[in-house]
Amino acid sequence: MRFSIQPTILFFDSGVGGLSVYKETKQLLPDCHYLYGFDNGFFPYSEKDEKDIIDRTLRICQKINQTYPLDLIVIACNTASTVVLPELRRNFSIPIVGTVPAIKPAAEMSETKHIGLIATKGTIKRTYVNDLIKNYAYHCMVEKIGSTKLVEIAEQKLRGGEVDLNVLKQELSPWKTMKSLDSVVLGCTHFPLIKEEIECCLPQVKFFVSSGKAIAKRVKFLLKGIEVRSKIQKKNLIFCTKPLEDDKSVQQILDFGEFENLVILSD
């Protein structure tokens, strides 16, 4: 699908995990104008107050929209998606896409009807997630692990750091002996970035399911017939709320997402 005029799409997360969703969308829609914003000044969202998450997400999206008129926003963060979508939709007239743990497809794929959900602590405790399980995995045994450490490991990897498999195995150790566990939901957008390492720790699992491809298809559908707000040729950019520690981290992120430049947003 090619666009003669580029729709501008913003992907937003507290960290770099949302780049996994961005990559899936860019692969499907290579000719759009892409912006990526991450609130590293308040990272991680998983254990933060809901009101603070809502306020910061809205403020950052509005600030980017002032300079780069947006046609669609993807909240590429499972934790934020459980709380911010209603407020964003009240303040924007453009499509807003959230990220939902892929519990339904995992339950459908599972042959043993024994599935696992790895997510942040914030996502795990949301009523919304329990409702998804009740509606779509009521016939399955569902295990849950809420982990901030896995998010930090994924961040380190994308910035050029090493993944400590021993730490990863420790986080996932409750599932090590569950032989019937055959499907795992990667319920945080960071986790596809360390999927290979997670697979090594859970060799009995046949299916690892994330939301990236489904979100990309949803974005493609919503862009049909959209009236693009800004019709100039644009560069793909990334935004953060706090300077990164070193130039290597900046370059790793720019290269991974094929972005032209990184912009630091001031409060």
Swiss-Prot record:
EC number(s) recorded for this UniProt protein: 5.1.1.3
GO biological processes: cell wall organization; peptidoglycan biosynthetic process; regulation of cell shape
Reaction catalysed by this enzyme: L-glutamate = D-glutamate
Pathway: Cell wall biogenesis; peptidoglycan biosynthesis
Database matches in InterPro entries: Asp/Glu/hydantoin_racemase, Asp/Glu_race, Asp/Glu_racemase_AS_1, Asp/Glu_racemase_AS_2, Glu_race
Disulfide pattern: none
Pfam families associated with the record: Asp_Glu_race (PF01177)
Binding-site list for substrate: 13-14, 45-46, 78-79, 189-190
Active site per UniProt: 77, 188
Record keyword Protein transport present: no
Keyword annotations of the record: Cell shape, Cell wall biogenesis/degradation, Isomerase, Peptidoglycan synthesis
GO molecular function, one term: glutamate racemase activity
Matches recorded under PANTHER family: GLUTAMATE RACEMASE
Functional description taken from the UniProt entry: Provides the (R)-glutamate required for cell wall biosynthesis.
Family: Belongs to the aspartate/glutamate racemases family.
Protein name: Glutamate racemase
Gene label: murI
